[in-house]
């Protein structure tokens, strides 16, 4: 039997890695390079990350339908092309800011502007809008990644293998976040933050070449033999395997209209699970570098800062790979239904983020404790994420998977928008109040971080309870 499906899975892994590298450039250059140049506060950064989330959420609603309409191959190509362009455009924000601010005629002059002056406020405001434009383009393209990847997984893998395949490509998020602190801060330090955006953004254009020549539907791919095709279609009640001589249009499934998708509890179960938990991962992704610099004076470009961020995402990467293996074990060894095995695995993984509650208390002993504990919490999220994505394939026909995934990603983006905005305003307020702001023994900004860690720790158990309440038993959607 050929194993072309795993080569396709590796492409999904690389795309997701590039996706998260592009998303991480701003968070790893914000505190040390961009904030001083454009006079940003945490509230400004929170505004950018929260609006990126809402741009992403809105785009996700249509991205799934777009991928279903365009097809996996073209849809994925367009998505990664758009987000790579958006990533590269960030590099021009400094020059563009000088065009709109009187008295500032060069990028070098931006740093020389007196902090707190009217010109500094203008620089901050103009640059925030320019970055938002670039983040909007980035979000528009990135929204297509997971709908296209999940649709590809449903095309190339039987149900019992989908969570494992999803955990592999979803690990790209962890690997991207893992590689980011090793690549991006040194690039920004030695060549400028603009070059970091250009080099990392350019990786997506390279990926497009491989996708163009390697991907095709399994029924049409010359790299997939009949034995592998039969394995892929083992779940079909009536599997029609097209031969080289004929292809039956009867194998096409009827898609569910977008508005009708909202009539199913299965859609709401998936959407609520994403709404409550996606923002936790994005909080770790966007704020971990700033957290280590604020709390431990460890900038992302310093050896300590790089070590802390690398350790965090190394833990995420290694442990999250078991996210897809555990339900596979339940199905093959315990004889459980794939959906029931997934829900049991998700319950187990929902307990992992609780360790984030100890990040701030143990941080008083060593900065390595928060790195380890946030890493464990992030690993729990990635393992959870691999399985929640796969529940869509359990419940919905393949023709609608990208649309449902887009709805869930939209819900996750809305949840993330709320968390990022709350975090940015909370940190700015807590820093300004100092000792007057306190929570559970912490004062000022550390108290703000502890509040956020408390929510992150509890979000997954709340999500699992609500999901199980909506869909207590396996019940696939029937298209009439």
Regions found by a protein language model. Name each.
Residues 76, 131, 343-346:
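Primarily marks hydrophobic transmembrane alpha-helices of the MFS/SLC 12-helix fold
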Residues 173-222:
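Helix-loop-helix hairpin linking two adjacent transmembrane segments in secondary transporters
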Residues 207-215, 354-362, 449-480:
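Multi-pass alpha-helical transporter architecture, strongest
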Residues 26-30, 262-324, 381-385, 389, ...:
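Extracytoplasmic gate region of multi-pass secondary transporters
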Residues 24, 53-61, 143, 177-178, ...:
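Residue-level signature of mid-helix packing/kink "hotspots" within the transmembrane helices
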Residues 339-387:
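C-terminal transmembrane helical hairpin of 12-TM major facilitator-type secondary transporters
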Residues 81-124, 347-364:
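C-terminal ends and interior cores of transmembrane alpha-helices
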